Structure formats: structure tokens, C-alpha cells
């Protein structure tokens, strides 16, 4: 393979043609600072507008400083990344950016996590030399996302991920020069636009121009109310990301997390993995029902069946492809199944009125906040899930309580809604839902033991993956996509009548829930995402039970309460319907 040799800070780098200076420097351990640049190779996300100019370097033979993110390496190039001229230029550029930024670091929601704040510290900015006209304050919020355009530095990361990666197109920069501002179409409230609340804009924003709508205060008020019984459920992807905020990145911290939640004052600590196993029973049964009818010649059956665990994906269908709503599984997400079971089964069992039984969820996802607020997910005005918080919010709460997380003892989830299998664990990564479904659907359909449990062909970070699973002579074609841009390709095939698949798993976030919009910030580190996925697969492999239908807690729930998968009570509590939510855009007069 042809390579290019160049010298960066007296070190030799050898890179592929087309590599820019930021990547070339990184390959030999030199970090060139950037604000706008972001490159997630395997997830298909690259933002390199060259607008922040923080990455300027000296290139021998050139008069002007060159932006490293926009400069392609050439043979024999000599580059210097930290000369006095370069450092002075970076400091001046950053001081000018800060002149248009509110001085609210101490009270900012991203204090300690802000890339702009970190860069000011690293570049030794100790005074505000310049004072410019700041952006006009503009606040906008939905149940999931808060936009504060006063803190926007126009890096365009959110615009790239929303338009190019997710193909949602809810955000774009309008205006020119000093009047440029990031906004929605016609500057409508984000709640009324085609935004699907996936939170990927929040995940890549270097400042707090975009953040989750925090519900920490509501949780703390509920915990302090002696008249309330407060239970918490935690999603599988939370346990492999929470540790990052406490120096344990890429590791599963399940036992420490459950201990921390008890110390925060939750009366019961449960596992959303239990509800993930329940989801497989319902969704897997629905798949077999549709598949058997389809294979028997009934072409009125909506095939392929598309998973419905991800609220960002469900919202994408409702807002962009509402005509394909019938292809979505009617099964609720694990979060909402848990809420329905907690309020309608566990609360009566404990003799507690459902309005005094508060269900809190800890999710890797900001879209779960909007999902919990959907009016159909409740009874007589009382929601099944009262409050949803993100992994980041839980980390803040643990800090509020002055815990030394690393030294916490390990503990287990409470029963009966804390028992789970390995199949429920892998819901947290792309491909995990369909792999879990196959483990159960195969054995229910064929009445035989699955020859292998690990479907490695379904794993990885390729945007679209497919496989054919032999159900004892019946070839079942399944497909996986993560990231809504990849999902759009599959959905357009379905709409055109060209989809060859029987079942499709889709996660809105690239990488699945491990890269959810509510997770600790990855800052462009793809290796961190891989380690999160590996930690989930390791926890799955270590489980004594790895198939959802083998979960004794699930078996008892059906025997005592639900009856059978997709039965009358299951349909009432665990299934839903979808709506045409396509926004009608009317220009303001």
C-alpha cells in the first residue's frame, strides 16, 4: 500500500494518501487541539469545516499558518505544531471565541466537561482580553433537549451529525458572518420540528449550547418525599459507561452502581435487563406470529418486522416515514414495559397506590425522556415511568452524595424485577436486540436447543449488517442498522417493496445505546465505544442464563400475572400503537 512520509515536530510519520495533519499527528502521539474537528471513522461521522482555526500549524515553505484539519499530508512535508507563533495564534483565536461567549462557567451545566473550557485551561488563557457583541440569548427546550444558542461557537458538529449522519435535518446554520446562528427551520421550537430527540447533537457539542433537559431536581424531590416509594431501573448500556466519570472507563460497574443507587435513597433497585427479557418474549412472539403467517402465503402481513426498543428510531418513523408504522413491532420498549409492570403488578403486590409508586429510569438516552412523557404510556394521567434521567445525570447525583465510587462495595439488584439473562444485557449495543431475539425465537419455533449462542456475524460497528439464520430448514433473513442515515437506506427499500428481510433491528444512535445521547462524552474516542460493547458481551458470557425465555422471573410473571406472550393482558400493558407525527411546516408571516 502506498504511503506518505512527513516530519511532524521532528518525528517521522507514515500515513495513507489523503490523511490530514490532525490524523497524521495523532498516529505518532501528537495531539493537535481542535474544537470543530471530529472524525469517527467506523461510525461514518466526520466534521471538518475548518472554522475554528484552533488547529493551525506551521508548514515549512508556506507563509501562512495552515489549519491542520483541512491540510492533506504530502511527501516530505515538514510540520511544526507548537512554535511560539503557533501558540500565540491559537491563544488569540481562542480569546476571540471567548469574547462572544457568556462568562457562566461556574453555573454552566457542562462545567468540567466543556471542550472550550478545557482548551482555555490548556492554552493558558488567564484573562478576557477582548469583549465583543455576544450572540442574542435564545433558549429552546423539549422534554429531551435544551438549546442555548448564546453558548454556540458555530463548530457545526451538530449540523453534520444531524444532517449527514442521522439524515434528520432538524438543525442548520443560517445567516452570514456575525449574524450566523444555528437554528431549526423557520426558527420553530425544536419540539414541533422533525427532530427525533436522538441526542447525537448533544453527544458531539463541545459546549453546553446543546444539552439534555435535566430531571435531577425532580428525582431528588421524590426521594425526599416520605409518602412516596421510589424505584429505579437501569438500562444495560449505563453500567458500561457510568464508570468513565469515575476513572473506570470501558468497564462494567454493575455492582457499584446498584450500591450507589441504594445510598442515594431508592427503595428498590431494579434492572431494565429484566424488561429486556420481557421485550424479547413479546417481540419474539410477535415476529414468529407474523413470520408464520407470511410463510403460509398471507401477504397482508407487514414484513419485515422492525424493532421498537429505540424511541429515537420510533420517532424517526412517525415523523419521517409514518406510512411504515405498521412494520414496527407493537411491543413497547424495555423502559416502558418495566414501568407498566412496576405500576400494574409490583405496586399492587406491595399494597402501594400507583400514584405513590414513583418509577425512575436511568438511561443512556435523552429520547427516553420524551418517550416517558408520551400520554399513552400511563393510566388516568399517572405515567408508567415518572422520571427518566441519563447516565450523565446519575453521575452528577453520585457526586452530590459525596461517594467515592471506586471504593463502593458491590451489590445485586432487587428481586423480582432485577433478575435477567445475558440476552437482556446485550440490548445495549448494536445487534444485541436481534441476537437476543434469535436465541429465543429459534428455540420456541423449532423446539430445539440453539446450536450456538454467540452470533458474531451480527456484531461489530459496520453501519448495516445482515445474516440468514437457519430456523431448522426455514431461512430467516435479518438485518441490523445503527445510525438513522443507515436506517433511512433500509426504510426506503421497504417503502419501494425491495426489502429481502424478515426482521430488522434499528438503533438511532451510531453504535447503539453504548453511544446514546445521554452517555458520558466520548470526545471522538471510538476505542472507548468498542470497550463498552466488549464489556456488555463479557457480562453476557458470564451470565448463568443467556436466553430470555429461561429467566425464572419472566416465567413467574407470565404464570402469576400476564398469562402468555402477546395474550390479552400482555397486549393491554406491554404493547402500543404509533401515530403520524410528520410536522407540517408553515412559514411564519
Named regions from a protein language model:
Residues 4-5, 12-90, 213-589:
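Iron-sulfur-associated redox domains of electron-transfer enzymes in respiratory
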Residues 5-8, 102, 143-145, 185-187, ...:
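A short, structure-level motif marking secondary-structure boundaries and short turns
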Residues 53-197, 203, 210-222, 229:
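Fe-S ferredoxin-like electron-transfer domains
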Amino acid at each position: 500500500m502506498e504511503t506518505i512520509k512527513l516530519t511532524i515536530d521532528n518525528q517521522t510519520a507514515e500515513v495513507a494518501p489523503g490523511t490530514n495533519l490532525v490524523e497524521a499527528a495523532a498516529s505518532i502521539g501528537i495531539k493537535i487541539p481542535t474544537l470543530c474537528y471530529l472524525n469517527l471513522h467506523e461510525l461514518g461521522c466526520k466534521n471538518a469545516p475548518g472554522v475554528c482555526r484552533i488547529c493551525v500549524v506551521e508548514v515549512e515553505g508556506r507563509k501562512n499558518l495552515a489549519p491542520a484539519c483541512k491540510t492533506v499530508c504530502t511527501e516530505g512535508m515538514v510540520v511544526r505544531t507548537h512554535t511560539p507563533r503557533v501558540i500565540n495564534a491559537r491563544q488569540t483565536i481562542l480569546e476571540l471565541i471567548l469574547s462572544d461567549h457568556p462568562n457562566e462557567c461556574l453555573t454552566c451545566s457542562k462545567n468540567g466537561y466543556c471542550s472550550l473550557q478545557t482548551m482555555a485551561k490548556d492554552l493558558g488563557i488567564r484573562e478576557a482580553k477582548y469583549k465583543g457583541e455576544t450572540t442574542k440569548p435564545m433558549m429552546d427546550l423539549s422534554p429531551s433537549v435544551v438549546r442555548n444558542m448564546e453558548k454556540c461557537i458555530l463548530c457545526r458538529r451538530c449540523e453534520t451529525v444531524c444532517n449527514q449522519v442521522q439524515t434528520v435535518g432538524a438543525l442548520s446554520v443560517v445567516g452570514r458572518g456575525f449574524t450566523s446562528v444555528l437554528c431549526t427551520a423557520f426558527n420553530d421550537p425544536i419540539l414541533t420540528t422533525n427532530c427525533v430527540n436522538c441526542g447525537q447533537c448533544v453527544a458531539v457539542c463541545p459546549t453546553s449550547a446543546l444539552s439534555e433537559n435535566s430531571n435531577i431536581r425532580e428525582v431528588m424531590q421524590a426521594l425526599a418525599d416520605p409518602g412516596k416509594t421510589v424505584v429505579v431501573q437501569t438500562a444495560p448500556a449505563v453500567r458500561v459507561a457510568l464508570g468513565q466519570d469515575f476513572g473506570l472507563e470501558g468497564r462494567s460497574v454493575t455492582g457499584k452502581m446498584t450500591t450507589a443507587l441504594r445510598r442515594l435513597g431508592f427503595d428498590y433497585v431494579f434492572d431494565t435487563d429484566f424488561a429486556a427479557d420481557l421485550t424479547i418474549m413479546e417481540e419474539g412472539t410477535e415476529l414468529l406470529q407474523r413470520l408464520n403467517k407470511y410463510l403460509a402465503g398471507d401477504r397482508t402481513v407487514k414484513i419485515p418486522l422492525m424493532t421498537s426498543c429505540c424511541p429515537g428510531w420510533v420517532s424517526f418513523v412517525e415523523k419521517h416515514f409514518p406510512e411504515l408504522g405498521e412494520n414496527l413491532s407493537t411491543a413497547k420498549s424495555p423502559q416502558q414495559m418495566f414501568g407498566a409492570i412496576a405500576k400494574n403488578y409490583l405496586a399492587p403486590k406491595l399494597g402501594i397506590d400507583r400514584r405513590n409508586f414513583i418509577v425512575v429510569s436511568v438511561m443512556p438516552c435523552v429520547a427516553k425522556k420524551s418517550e416517558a412523557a408520551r400520554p399513552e404510556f400511563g393510566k388516568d394521567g399517572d405515567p408508567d415511568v415518572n422520571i427518566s434521567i441519563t447516565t450523565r445525570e446519575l453521575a452528577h447525583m453520585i457526586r452530590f452524595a459525596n461517594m467515592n465510587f471506586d471504593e463502593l462495595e458491590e451489590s445485586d439488584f432487587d428481586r423480582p424485577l432485577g433478575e435477567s439473562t445475558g440476552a437482556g444485557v446485550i440490548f445495549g449495543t448494536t445487534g444485541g436486540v436481534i441476537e437476543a431475539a434469535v436465541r429465543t425465537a429459534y428455540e420456541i419455533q423449532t423446539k430445539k436447543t440453539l446450536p450456538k449462542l454467540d452470533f458474531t456475524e451480527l456484531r461489530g460497528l459496520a453501519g448495516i449488517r445482515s445474516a440468514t439464520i437457519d430456523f431448522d430448514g426455514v431461512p430467516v433473513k435479518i438485518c441490523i442498522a445503527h445510525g438513522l442515515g443507515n436506517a433511512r437506506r433500509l426504510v426506503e427499500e421497504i417503502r419501494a417493496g425491495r426489502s429481502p428481510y424478515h426482521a430488522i433491528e434499528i438503533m438511532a444512535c451510531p453504535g447503539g445505546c453504548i453511544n446514546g445521547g445521554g452517555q458520558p462524552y466520548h470526545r471522538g474516542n471510538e476505542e472507548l465505544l468498542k470497550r463498552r460493547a466488549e464489556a456488555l458481551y463479557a457480562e453476557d458470557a458470564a451470565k448463568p442464563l443467556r436466553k430470555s425465555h429461561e429467566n425464572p422471573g419472566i416465567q413467574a410473571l407470565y404464570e402469576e400475572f400476564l398469562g402468555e406472550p402477546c395474550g390479552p393482558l400482555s397486549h393491554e400493558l406491554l404493547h402500543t400503537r404509533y401515530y403520524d407525527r410528520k410536522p407540517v411546516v408553515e412559514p411564519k408571516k
